[in-house]
Structure formats: C-alpha cells, structure tokens
UniProtKB/Swiss-Prot annotation:
Domain of life: Eukaryota
InterPro entries: EREX-like, PX_dom, PX_dom_sf
Organism: Arabidopsis thaliana
Any one of the GO BP annotations: protein transport
Signal peptide interval: none
Coiled-coil region list: 401-474, 503-555
UniProt keywords, alphabetically: Coiled coil, Cytoplasm, Endosome, Lipid-binding, Membrane, Protein transport, Transport
Encoding gene per record: EREL1
Compositionally biased intervals (Acidic residues): 704-714
Domain PX: 48-165
Biased composition (Low complexity): 172-193
Locations listed in the record: Cytoplasm, Cytosol; Endosome membrane
UniProt name for this protein: PX domain-containing protein EREL1
Length: 723
C-alpha cells in the first residue's frame, strides 16, 4: 500500500498533477491579449488563472423563464509568456456543487463561505453584478490553496484539459511560424494515421458541471456537439459570446471531444491504444501538441506524448500492469521532466536530426546530440536537459532564490506590522473596556436615581389615593346623615331649619373637598409630566456627562503633562541659579587670589638722592634673584588668569538656559577683570625690567670705576719703578 503524499508547499515545484504541470496564479491586473504580463515569472512553468468577467441571461427552452449563466474565463500562460483564454458557462448552482464536492474530497479543510443564494426573481443588473463580483472573489480565495487548485474537482469544473489543448495549439502555431526556415532542411514529418482525426466511439460521457447535451448522437453515428458548457439549456436557443466561438473546425473538434476531463480521458486512451501498432524504434520529429496525456488519479492508466526544446519527442510505453504519470514542465520550452513509477520498459528518444537512440533501463544515458539524462531517483524519474541550457537554468535558480529572499523579508515586515497592529488593537480594546466599565457605572447610577425618583412619586401617588378615599368616605357619611335627618318627621321646625343650615354647610364642605380632589388630580398629572421631563433631562445629562467625562480625562492628562514639564523647568531653573551663584563665588575667589599674588610681586627697592637704587638686601645678586622670581610669579599669574577664563567659559556653556542679559553682563565682567589683571601684570613686568636694567647699569659703573682706579695705581707704581 502506497503512503499518502504530503500536501504541496510551493507552486511550480514539478509535482502538479494538472495537464502540462500547470499551477494556479493570481490574475493579471491589466489584460493585453497574448502579450499579457502576469504577476510572476512565466519561465517557471505553465500557469492558469480564473476570472468571471461577465454574465448572460439565456432561456432554458422556448417557453421557459430565462436562466443566468456566469462566464468563467480560464486563461493559460505558457513558459514563453503567451496567454490564451477559454470561456466556460456555469450556473450559480454549479458553484455550490463545486463547493460540496470539494468538501467531500477534502473533509478536513476549511473553505471560504460561498456567496448567499437568495432569490433572484427580479434579475436586476446591480444584483447580478454584485453576485458576479462575489463569485470571482470567492473562487480566487478558493484557488489560493495550492492543494485545492491542483484537485481533480477543480480541473473538471474549469475544464483545464481543454484549455491546455487550445493553449498548446496556439503555442505550436507560433512555433511552426517561427521555425519554417529551420524545418525546411529536415525531413518531411510523419504522423500516425490514428492521430489525424479524433473519432468518438461507444457511449458518450457528460460532465457533472457541463451541459447535458454536450455530446448528442447524430443520424450518421458521429457525435454532434451542442452548445459549450451550458447546463439544462436547449441547443436551439443559446448563443455564446463571439470570443467563445471557434472558427477552426479542428479546434472545434478537439474542444468538443475534450469538453471535460472524463471525455478527454476516454478519447486520449482510445488514441494511445491505437498507437500501440505504431513502430517504436523510429519516429520522425514533429510537434504533436494536440494530444496530451491525461492523468488518472485512481492509478488506472496514464500515457502521453512530451516534446523537448530541439524538436525531439519522447514516447513512453508502460507495461499493461504498471502505468506512468507524465507531466510536461517546460521552463521556457527548454526543460522537461519525466516521472515514472515502477516501469520496466525503456523509453525512446528521437532527435530532430533523424538520430535514433534507445534509452535502456540504466540510471542514465549520455546522448551525442547535446542532451544529458541525469537520474534523480533510481527507476522512478529521469531528467533530460540540454548541455547549453545549464547556465540559463542556474541563472533562473539564482533569480528564484533572490525572489524567495525578498519574499521572506517582505513577510517579516508584514509580521512586524501585524504585531504592531495587534498591540494597538489590544491597547484600544483595554481603553474600550475601561470606557465601557465607566459607562456601566454611570448607567447604574442614573438608573438608581431614576428608580428613587419613581419610588418617591409612587409614594406620593399612593398617599393621594388614600386621601381621596378618606374624602369619599366622609362625603358618604355626610350624605347618610342628611338622608337620616330628612327622613325624621318627628323633629320640630327649629331642627329642620338647623338641618337645612347644616346641609348647606356640608354641601359647601363637599364642594371644597371636590375642588381639593380636582386640584390633587391636576397636581398629580403635572407631577407625572414633570417626572417624564426629568427623566428625559436626566438621560441628556447622562449623555453630556459621558462626553464631558472623556473631555475632562483628556484635559487631566494634558494638565498632568504640563505639570510635569513645569516641574522639570523649575528644577532646571533652580540648578541654573545654583550654578550661577557658585560661578560668581568662584570668580570672586579667583580675583582675590590674583590680586594677592600681584601684591607679592612688589620689590623692596628704594632710590637715593641721585636717582640710584639702594638695595635693602645685602647684595645686588639678591636683588637680581628677587626680580627673576617676580617675573616667574607674574607669568604664573597670567596662566592662572587664562585658566580662570577657560573655566568661566565652561561654566557659561553649562548654563545655556540662563537669561541672555545676565550671561552677557557676567561675560563682560570677566573680560574686564581679566584685562585689568593682564595690564597690571604687563606694567609690573615693565617696572621690573626697568629696575633690572638700572641695577645692571650701576653694577657696570662701579666696575668701571674700580678698573680705572686699579689702572691709575698700576701707572703710579710703574712710574715709581721707573724713577
């Protein structure tokens, strides 16, 4: 027993069981006939898409009501980028039957809900157009599942085999037109007589989704074909669109014979059974694209004809007990794969140069025509590739990998955005829950207030009723007294007069009570109307309170943010003031230090009456030493003042947020003080240098005097010696 295969994960991976190995693709946004650009690379393989562009109303018979049919357009794109279209008419019930069959075939899958059926007695254009759009959206969601898009039920519903045949015929016509010059040098093509025309024999087959009159036996025995894919409609009343009408008789014959998968299977099996008498050791090269292998999913049989890029044709003949499943996966008509299962008979490859080679049962055979057969699985699959197309295949694989990487990055971005949206949604849900809770509390409070008001009004109403009952009882008693007094005939005239007066008083009292009762009833009505008005006012107030509550919350949050900002600004201002005070204190201390240091630079020198310096110290050398020390201290003070200026500049940079005027004043003060100290130091250095020059001059004069005295002494001694 064979193991069940896992569901496919990628499109165009070479495992599609559909004709030509095609896979579903989203429809293009803009249609341009044969040169339509699809939203994927066409070199990956055959692709098909499904759209529902229009609908048509046709009568079921001459005297019956019209029936709405939806035109299902199946577009097929070849690896060369050529687009072909084929239309199929389906009723709304056919779509529902498709969903039922898919649920029966895939019981564990989840399916998108079909559009509601409803009643379309009044077939307005708006309703029909809305249903057409919903059907197109629904079938797009359905086919986005790769496993459903490759299923037999969908292929039968869309008649993919007939669409594949028409696409292959269109591609072959273009290939034959472009290769006329090349094919003129080759030998004349030979076709087996059984491939010239298709003749249907035996019983006719009908599609579950198509018309009941797809094949009707004519008087001469050949199948007469009704209108294409119109279920439950007479052939004499239906006329399809102009783009569905085929002008070529052979195309009509092929489409009529292959209008659905079951009929295509029986026809292909009949034709391939006739091919058993055809010689298998030698075949002329020719494209035979009007016959395609039909896959049988229950494992009965599968035979086919596959064509290569250079005009070679590969025929496979499996054993009667074992059948192979073959699919054509052309990558720009340059590669194809042959999938076989437990085959024991070797295939036959015939090139377009009339070279004849046999493929044996080995794992692979190298061919002299430039084709290499590389086995991927022993005895189960073979891949035939031209040598010159390996580089192109590598480029295609690299491009595919780049697209996969880009798709992965896009998916990660989408996941990140989705996570952000989920977080925002959670936050909004929390906010909504909080608001709902507040709303519930407000509702409860208003409800309690209303109940209290109603209870108080009820109590007042009950009290009023009790008062009315008491008044009625009193009036009844008074009437009884009056009657008893009127009935008493034994009373005297004064008593009669008194009773008349009492009766008059009682009648007045009764009128007063009645007036009071009317007033109370009127007051009750007014209170009831007032209570209703109060209830309306309370409802309005509750609504206004809800709105004001939301606004107050917003104002509260805004005020809290303003408060935090103000506190931050206040803290910064306090820090700036502290820094300012510290900087000023430091400035004063630095000024004191500089002033004290400059005071120490005074020399204890004095001058005599002739203007010469008199040194208090013992020797002139001490004076010179003091002057040098004074110069060094002045230079050190200048460096210290420069350092203080730099430190002050740094403090100013730190307090950027201070007032502009205060900062400018402090900068000017620092500069003025620094200039004063610098000028003072310069003057003190000049004084020291003058004093130094004066001292040096005095020293030189004393030395000259001593030398003159010594010279005079020497001359005197010489003169004495001469004498």
């Amino acid at each position: 027993m064979m193991q069940r295969r896992s569901p496919p994960k990628h499109r165009h991976d070479g495992t599609s069981p559909l004709p030509l190995g095609m896979d579903w693709s989203p429809p293009p946004r803009k249609w341009n006939g044969r040169d339509t650009v699809w939203p994927h690379d066409p070199r990956t393989g055959w692709s098909y898409c499904v759209t529902i562009p229009s609908w048509i109303v046709l009568p079921k018979s001459r005297n019956s009501d019209p029936v709405v049919f939806y035109r299902v357009q199946v577009s097929v794109q070849s690896p060369e980028g050529i687009t072909t279209m084929r239309g199929v008419l389906r009723r709304f019930n056919d779509f529902l039957k498709l969903l039922t069959d898919l649920k029966r075939t895939f019981p564990r899958k989840g399916f998108p809900s079909a559009p509601p059926k409803g009643l379309l007695r009044m077939k307005s254009r708006a309703v029909l157009e809305e249903r057409r759009c919903s059907l197109e959206e629904w079938i797009t969601k359905l086919l986005s599942d790769i496993e459903l898009a490759r299923s037999v039920v969908v292929a039968s519903f869309l008649e993919l085999e007939a669409a594949a045949r028409s696409a292959c015929q269109d591609v072959d016509q273009n290939a034959s037109d472009s290769n006329n010059d090349r094919s003129s040098t080759s030998s004349s093509p030979m076709v087996h007589p059984s491939l010239s025309l298709f003749h249907a024999g035996g019983s006719t087959l009908t599609s579950d989704y198509g018309s009941d009159t797809a094949y009707e036996t004519s008087e001469v025995g050949s199948p007469s074909v009704g209108q294409d894919d119109i279920s439950e409609i007479g052939t004499e009343d239906l006329t399809l669109d102009e783009d569905l009408t085929l002008t070529n008789p052979i195309e009509k014959l092929v489409n009529f014979s292959m209008s659905n998968i079951d009929e295509g299977l029986s026809m292909s099996e009949t034709i391939l059974e006739q091919l058993e008498d055809f010689p298998k050791h030698k075949v002329r090269s020719r494209y035979v694209n009007n016959i395609l292998g039909k896959d049988v999913y229950n494992g009965n049989a599968s035979k086919g004809v596959f064509l290569a890029n250079n005009g070679s044709r590969l025929l496979s003949e499996p054993e009667p007990s074992t059948h192979s499943v073959m699919h054509d996966r052309n990558d720009s008509a340059e590669r194809f794969a042959l999938h076989t299962g437990q085959t024991s008979t070797s295939g036959l490859l015939i090139s377009s140069r009339d070279s004849h080679l046999d493929l044996r049962q080995g794992p692979g055979v190298s061919l002299g025509t430039g084709l290499v057969c590389n086995p991927e699985r022993q005895g189960s699959a073979q891949i035939v590739l031209p040598l010159e197309l390996r580089n192109k295949l590598n480029r295609i694989l690299l491009a595919t990998n780049e697209r996969l990487v880009n798709a992965k990055t896009d998916m990660e971005d989408l996941i990140a955005r989705l996570n952000q949206e989920i977080a925002v949604k959670d936050y909004l849900n929390k906010k909504v829950n909080d608001l709902e809770g507040e709303l519930e509390t407000t509702k409860q409070r208003s409800k309690e207030n209303l109940e209290q008001a109603i209870m108080s009004e009820r109590e007042r109403f009950n009290q009023m009723q009790w008062d009315m009952e008491e008044l009625r009882q009193k009036s009844y008693e008074m009437e009884m007294k009056l009657k008893s007094r009127e009935d008493g005939s034994s009373h005297a005239e004064p008593t009669v007069q008194s009773t008349i007066s009492e009766k008059h008083v009682l009648s007045k009292e009764l009128d007063a009570r009645k007036q009071q009762l009317e007033d109370l009833s009127r007051r009750y009505e007014e209170l009831e109307a007032k209570s209703k008005a109060d209830m309306k006012v309370l409802v309005k107030e509750v609504k206004s309170l809800r709105r004001s509550h939301v606004e107050l919350e917003k104002e509260l949050t805004h005020s809290l943010t303003d408060k935090t900002n103000a506190e931050k600004l206040l803290q910064e201002e306090r820090k700036l003031l502290e820094n300012t005070v510290a900087a000023r204190k430091k400035l004063l201390s630095d000024c004191r230090i500089l002033h004290d240091r400059l005071k120490e630079y005074n020399l204890n020198l004095s001058m005599d009456g002739n203007g010469n310096f008199v040194d208090d110290s013992t020797t002139i050398s001490d004076v010179l030493r003091l002057l040098s020390i004074s110069d060094d201290q002045i230079e050190e003070a200048q460096l210290l003042s420069g350092f203080d200026e730099n430190a002050a500049a740094e403090d100013i940079d730190k307090t950027l947020s201070m007032d502009t005027e205060t900062r400018i004043m402090e900068d000017e003060l620092r500069k003025i003080l620094a200039n004063i100290f610098v000028e003072n130091a310069k003057l003190r250095k000049q004084v020291n240098s003058a004093m130094l020059r004066a001292l040096q001059k005095d020293v030189k004069t004393t030395e000259d005097v001593n030398e003159e005295n010594s010279d005079e002494k020497d001359e005197a001694s010489r003169e004495t010696l001469k004498r």
